[in-house]
Amino acid sequence: MTSSGNPTCRVGLIVRLTLSILLVAATIVPPLGAQGDSAHALPRGANGPPPASPLISPRALEDVAPDPHTVEVYLTASPNRLSLVRGSTTDVYAYNGQVPGPTLQLREGDRVIVHFRNNLPVPTTVHWHGLHIPASSDGSPFHPVAPGARHDYVFTILRGAAGTYWYHPHPHHQTGYQVAKGLYGAIVIRAADDPLPASLPEKLLILSDNRFLPDGSIDLPDQTTLQGGIDFENGREGNVLFVNGQVMPTVTMRSGEVQRWRVVNASAARVYRLALTGHTFLHVGSDGGLFEHPVELTELTLANGERAELLVRATGAPGTRATLQTLAYDRYIPQTRPKDWNQPRDLLAVQYTHDAPEPPATLPNVLRHVPALDTTRASATRVMALSQGMINGRMMDVSRVDVSARLGATEIWQIENLVGMDHPFHLHGFQFQVLERNGVPERVRRWKDTVNVPKHETVRLIVRYDRYPGKWMFHCHILTHEDHGMMGILEIR
C-alpha cells in the first residue's frame, strides 16, 4: 500500500467510506444500481428509436509518407463540441475532430510515424493497445504529453501482427475521464498473405457506451456521490450504446452473403455478450489476430479492451431484418448491480436486401499456424491476485517496480480474482496465450493482450518477453479501477 499522502490512496479511502455507507443502506433500499431515472436521464430528443441510418466506418488517418513502406500520419487531441445523440450537442475531447477517432490503417512491415499534438487543457498520452512496440512509444503513464506539446510515436509493425487493435489515452488517474470524453479509435493491421478472401465485405464495429445529463453533457459524477460510488465499484457504464458513434445503425446484406466484422470493445467497463438473432458467428480472430481454425458460436462475450474478428453469413430471407444485441451478463457485485443488468440491448440492425442471393463463399478451414509457447521453458510462475482496487494487495506506485524479468524469458502468470465481480486483465507490450481457466485447458490457442477473469475464477497464461526491454504496465481494464490504482509495473531488462 502506498503512503497516506498519495492522492490515489486518499481518493480510494473516500470512495470506500462512501461505499461502506451505501452497502449498509442496501439492506433497507433496493440495490444501488436501481437508482432513480435522474441518474440515467437521456438528453432531450434521445428517447425513442433513432431514425434508421447506415453504419458508417470512421474515416482513416491520411498517410502522407511518399515511401510505400512507411505510414506517416498526424493525430491531434482537442476539445470540441459534437452531436453524439439526437437533439443535443456535447462538449467532448476528440481525435482530429471526430468521435470515435480516425482509424489507423497499417500493414505488416510498415514503419509508422504518428505526429501527435495535445491541444487539450490537460496532459495525455496515446496508448496503442495490444501493439508489440518499443516501451518509449507505448503511450503509458511514464510518458505524458503536456498541454500544447507535440510528440512523435515511431514504431514498426512486425510480421504476424495482423489483426484489430485500438488506441486511447493512458495518463495516470485520467484514462477513464478522457475516454468518456471521446478519445478512442481503431487500428487495423493487414497481412499480405491474409487467408480470408479479399472479396469479403468488411465492417468495423467499435462498441462504446456513455451516460448523459438532460442538457446533453456527459455525466461524470464526483466519486463521493451515490452514482460516483457506483461507478467506482462497477466501472462506469453508459445508458446510451454506440456502434462507431452511432445509435442503432443498419448494415445491409444480401441473403447468403458473408461479411467480415472487426469488433472492438472500447467501453470503460461494459462487457458485451453479442448475439445476432437467427444466426451463428464464425469466430476467426481475437486480440492478436487470426486463430488456426474458425470456431462456430451462437454468442460471443467481449470484455472491455478485447477485440474479435467474426465472419457473419446472412441467413435471413430478403426484406427481413436481424438484430445484433448484447445479452444479459452479470459481472457485478450484487449490491451495486444495475437494475436493468438482465435486459438485452439492441446495438445494430441487419437489413436483408431484395438483391439476388450471394453465391456461397468458400472459406478456409485452416487460417494460420499459431505456435504454442513452451511451458517447460517458463522460468517463473507469478501469482497476480486481483482484489477491489489492488493487485497483490498493493495500489499503483509509479516509483515502484512490481515485477522484474529478463529479456527473452518465458513466464506463467496465474491471475486470481478474489472478489465477486469480473476484472479484465491487460498486459502492455506483449501478447500472451491463455493456458487454462479454473484448471480447464483453453480450447482455442490464440494471441491475447486482454483477458476477462470472472468473479472468483483463476486464469493461467504464458508470456514471452521478446524484443523490447523497458517498463510496462499491467492492470485491470475497468478504467475507473486502473485510474484508482489497480495497476502494476513490469520491468524487462
For each predicted feature, which ranges?
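Terminal connector regions
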Residues: 125, 172-176, 182, 317-351, ...
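Bacterial N-terminal signal peptides
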Residues: 17-28
